């Protein structure tokens, strides 16, 4: 998964052509200080069900559960971070995972627990 080139065009090309299993890893967000101390891991890929705090942008400070992870567009959708369209419907505002902090993990998946244990060392 290592990107060896420093050229911006090749960086962009890598992101554009990245396969889904690589995109999943690129959708990482930092953990809160409490979670970092508890699990000894600095960041993890965001998953549906994680509770996050938005750190940057118009919705800064807002907290909510992740409703959807869009690997194609490298965006996540958070409960409560919505826009009202002109026809009145509510749509989720797309947020890049680097702009959020995970404050509560969804640990229903046993594989995810094993990943955290393995990465903690």
Swiss-Prot record:
Protein source organism: Pyrococcus furiosus (strain ATCC 43587 / DSM 3638 / JCM 8422 / Vc1)
Protein name as it appears in the record: Large ribosomal subunit protein uL24
Gene3D superfamilies: 2.30.30.30
Matching PANTHER family: 60S RIBOSOMAL PROTEIN L26 FAMILY MEMBER
SMART domains, per database record: KOW (SM00739)
Disulfide-bond pairs as recorded: none
One Gene Ontology term, aspect cellular component: large ribosomal subunit
Annotated function: One of two assembly initiator proteins, it binds directly to the 5'-end of the 23S rRNA, where it nucleates assembly of the 50S subunit.
Keywords recorded for this protein, A-Z: Ribonucleoprotein, Ribosomal protein, RNA-binding, rRNA-binding
Quaternary structure and interacting proteins, as annotated: Part of the 50S ribosomal subunit.
């Amino acid at each position: 998964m290592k990107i060896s080139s420093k050229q911006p065009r090749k960086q962009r090309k890598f992101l554009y052509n990245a396969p889904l299993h690589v995109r999943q890893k690129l959708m990482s967000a930092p953990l809160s200080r409490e979670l970092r101390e508890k699990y000894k891991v600095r960041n993890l890929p965001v998953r549906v069900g994680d509770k996050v705090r938005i750190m940057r942008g118009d919705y800064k400070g807002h907290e909510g559960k992740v409703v959807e992870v869009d690997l194609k567009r490298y965006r996540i959708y958070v409960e409560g971070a919505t826009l009202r369209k002109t026809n009145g419907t509510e749509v989720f505002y797309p947020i890049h995972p680097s702009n959020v902090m995970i404050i509560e993990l969804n640990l229903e998946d046993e594989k995810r627990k094993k990943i955290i244990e393995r990465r903690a060392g």
